[in-house]
Swiss-Prot record:
GO molecular function, one term: acetylcholine receptor inhibitor activity
Record key words, sorted: Acetylcholine receptor inhibiting toxin, Amidation, Cleavage on pair of basic residues, Disulfide bond, Neurotoxin, Postsynaptic neurotoxin, Secreted, Signal, Toxin
Modified residues (Glutamine amide): Q65
Function statement: Alpha-conotoxins act on postsynaptic membranes, they bind to the nicotinic acetylcholine receptors (nAChR) and thus inhibit them. Globular isomer (C1-C3; C2-C4) selectively inhibits neuronal (non-muscle) nAChR subtypes particularly human alpha-3-beta-2/CHRNA3-CHRNB2 (IC(50)=35.7 nM) and alpha-9-alpha-10/CHRNA9-CHRNA10 nAChRs (IC(50)=569 nM), while the ribbon isomer (C1-C4; C2-C3) shows weak inhibition on alpha-3-beta-2/CHRNA3-CHRNB2, but not on all other receptors tested.
Protein name: Alpha-conotoxin G1.5
Family: Belongs to the conotoxin A superfamily.
Organism: Conus geographus (Geography cone)
Gene Ontology CC terms, in alphabetical order: extracellular region; host cell postsynaptic membrane
Length: 67
């Protein structure tokens, strides 16, 4: 293989590595955002439910978890 061909292969490998790394970072960012949103929603619902006697009476195991 000539020097030019080896350099071209190196550039293609570097580009492919960068693209794979970039897309996997974006996917993990989406997962983290989804987990944070779920935690926020569940804590809000838990506070709302557990502050009402009827709801907390129907879900005792759910309301005891956070307290």
């Amino acid at each position: 293989m000539g020097m030019r061909m080896m350099f071209t292969v190196f550039l293609l490998v570097a580009l492919a590595t960068t693209v794979v790394s970039f897309t996997s970072d974006r996917a993990s960012d989406r997962r983290n955002a989804a987990v944070k949103a779920f935690d926020l929603i569940s804590s809000t619902v838990k506070k709302g439910c557990c502050s009402h006697p009827a709801c907390s009476g129907n879900n005792p195991e759910y309301c005891r978890q956070g307290r």
